[in-house]
Regions:
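Long, hydrophobic, amphipathic alpha-helical segments used as structural scaffolds
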Residues: 34, 169-172
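Short glycine/serine- and small hydrophobic-enriched flexible loop segments
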Residues: 162-167
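Zn-dependent metallopeptidase/amidohydrolase metal-coordination segment
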Residues: 76-158, 176
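Single conserved hydrophobic/aromatic residue that forms the stacking wall/gate
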Residues: 174-183
């Protein structure tokens, strides 16, 4: 008896359905070829995040007001040591100090926030909580995230989202524009 939990990822709902059906057919074929039985159960699924330009621009404006993350001397030493362990980093220490230009893309990652975004206008923010160049799901991400570097990033994210929420509350134009775009 073998159990596997996983799921196909694709940039859109129809793509996930098609890919899922192919995975099922491949598993059925493998079961026939090995004279075994294949059964499956869909336990959950996540829709891709539906981007909302109105909210993304609002959040980006609030992030630009607050700026990036500066390291203390101690944090910089830690970051440099951690940076030495990274494989093919795509950015350098210091990049966390500036806010990157807003690029509107559709995330292909799996998240329950994607499900929410199909019910209400949704957006979020990505903040440097790791040493620049760190790969997600790595020990380096965990190591940096548990330090003041991670705390600074989390705090900045909270401030950006809170300031954005206040702006939404007091300026109904953003709310109506986000809803119009979503519909």
């Amino acid at each position: 008896y073998i159990s596997e939990v996983g799921g196909p990822r694709q940039g859109n709902v129809e793509g996930v359905r098609k890919l899922f059906n192919r995975v099922v057919k491949a598993a059925e074929g493998a079961a026939k070829g090995t004279e075994t039985k294949m059964v499956f159960e869909v336990m959950h699924g996540n829709y891709p995040l539906m981007p909302n330009e109105t909210l993304s621009v609002l959040i980006d404006e609030e992030l630009k007001k607050l700026g990036g993350i500066s390291y203390t001397d101690e944090e910089n030493l830690f970051a440099q040591e951690l940076y030495k362990t990274l494989l093919n980093p795509d950015s350098v220490i210091g990049d966390q100090q500036s806010v990157q230009p807003l690029v509107l893309t559709q995330s292909k990652g799996s998240t329950d926030v994607g499900d929410v975004s199909w019910k209400v206008p949704t957006s979020g923010v990505r903040i440097a909580t790791w040493v620049p160049g760190t790969s997600a799901h790595s020990w380096q991400a965990v190591a940096a995230g548990g330090t003041t570097i991670g705390t600074k990033g989390s705090t900045l994210a909270a401030k950006v989202l809170a300031n954005s929420a206040v702006k939404l509350y007091f300026c109904l134009l953003y709310t109506s524009d986000a809803a119009d775009e979503w519909l």
